[in-house]
Amino acid sequence: MASGSSSIAIGGLFENAEVTTSGRPVLRRNEVECFLLSSIDIDSEDDPPRFTALRSGNLILTTHRLIWIPSQSNESVPSSIPLSAVTHIYSHKKSIKSMFHSPRIRFQADPGSIVVTIVFRGKGDFDGFLSKLWECWRGRAWEEEEKSESETSKSGSGTVAQGLYGNDGTVRMVGLAGILRKEQEQWESTDKSLQDAFQDLNALMSKAKEMVSLAEKMRQKLLSAPSSQNGSTDDEEMGSKEEMQQWMLSVGIISPVTKESAGALYHQELSRQLADFVRIPLEKAGGMISLTDMYYHFNRARGTELISPDDLWQACTLWEKFDVPVMLRKFDSGVMVIQNKSHSDEEVMSRIRMLVTKTETLRVGVTASDAALTLKIAPAMAKEHLLSAETKGLLCRDMSPDGLRFYFNLFPEIDPTNLHIVKEFGTYGEWIKATSLLSV
């Protein structure tokens, strides 16, 4: 769910920047993240200053903007500067004085030719960032959409003259000359159709990032949509929501965090991006998903920017430091899963108890597949819950040639001093009645 603050305009230059619940920026259409730095100040070079300085935050360079996000201890508002407003980037000159000061990048921006200084307080690739800033500014990616729309409108404006008279008012040729002319026009029409086809193909390729961006916005709206108040949801609406979730998972992540763009903050930013991404797979999996399955889903969404299992594990362990609604959990068996913080083990145990105390299951027990159908989760996750219930004394296991089955634990209800007394109350009595049906 995207969160933002009220729009700010410091000196008419800064814009409000939307961020997700984990602190990642919400990118715009066709916008791609290029570089990330930590411990960055943004100051005004003018005297008196023309805007309030921004202190100690993360600076994210994209193809369209410079996005400044405050650190956790900072109460400033996430802000951005559009690269389209930058009119000049000053060249960096090394001097003896610069060796004893924090590295700085200065640029001029409209309105009013404001001189802005980016101050590096932490350790970062200064030269790499400056080079990427020049590249993004000169690339002018924000103008590509206007150019593509203009070319598309021009490509469809041509028409072929028909009838007795041509476009210039002259009479069309007939006879053999007319046949040759007609054949030439057909070749020209075919050539034009091929050119249009290739233009459409190029346009389709150029729209790929736009489609991913659209999917990301729809994903944010879907996550922020309020749930039904009466607890009931229309079946058709629910089906459409699940179909939309599956489609968005297949589209992928608009701008995956990479080691090249994030540098030393790679695992931190990867952790934030994973926290945003995991919410839909978690909802689809019933609130809990194994780390192995999430590795598959996350790498599939990242496309060619694959991560290692160790990177995924480190990203999950960093959730303890962030205020995110998900967490990493390790069962006694060693299986690691991702689950919502709102997940309640007591509720799961209650549902398992209801399952194993039914008349049928009192006789034959339950398997992991049976529990998976009841809990609406994967069988592997259901097995972990059954093992956890066994550890808590709720269940007993039975290893047989047919596999592992779990039964309700009746031992606490049996009097060890008189094993032959049958209680008329409790689950033990119900078990006696259920098993007696087998002899009838």
From Swiss-Prot:
Gene3D superfamilies in UniProt: 6.10.140.260, Pleckstrin-homology domain (PH domain)/Phosphotyrosine-binding domain (PTB), Winged helix-like DNA-binding domain superfamily/Winged helix DNA-binding domain
Cellular component terms per the entry's GO annotation: early endosome; ESCRT II complex; late endosome; plasma membrane
Coiled coil location: 192-212
Record-level GO BP terms: embryo development ending in seed dormancy; endosome transport via multivesicular body sorting pathway; multivesicular body sorting pathway; protein transport; seedling development; vacuole organization
Taxonomy, superkingdom: Eukaryota
Region (Disordered): 144-163
Limits of the GLUE N-terminal domain: 17-97
Protein location: Endosome
Pfam families registered for this protein in UniProt: EAP30 (PF04157), Vps36_ESCRT-II (PF11605)
Alphabetic keyword roster: Coiled coil, Endosome, Protein transport, Transport
Presence of the UniProt keyword Ion transport in the record: no
Residue ranges constituting the GLUE C-terminal domain according to the UniProt record: 115-149
InterPro entries in alphabetical order: GLUE_dom, PH-like_dom_sf, Snf8/Vps36, Vps36, WH-like_DNA-bd_sf, WH_DNA-bd_sf
Transport listed as a keyword: yes
One GO MF term attached to the UniProt entry: phosphatidylinositol-3-phosphate binding
General function of this protein: Component of the ESCRT-II complex (endosomal sorting complex required for transport II), which is required for multivesicular body (MVB) formation and sorting of endosomal cargo proteins into MVBs. The ESCRT-II complex is probably involved in the recruitment of the ESCRT-III complex.
Subunit composition and interactions: Component of the endosomal sorting required for transport complex II (ESCRT-II), composed of VPS22, VPS25 and VPS36.
Family per similarity comment: Belongs to the VPS36 family.
Record's protein name: Vacuolar protein sorting-associated protein 36
Lineage of the organism: Eukaryota, Viridiplantae, Streptophyta, Embryophyta, Tracheophyta
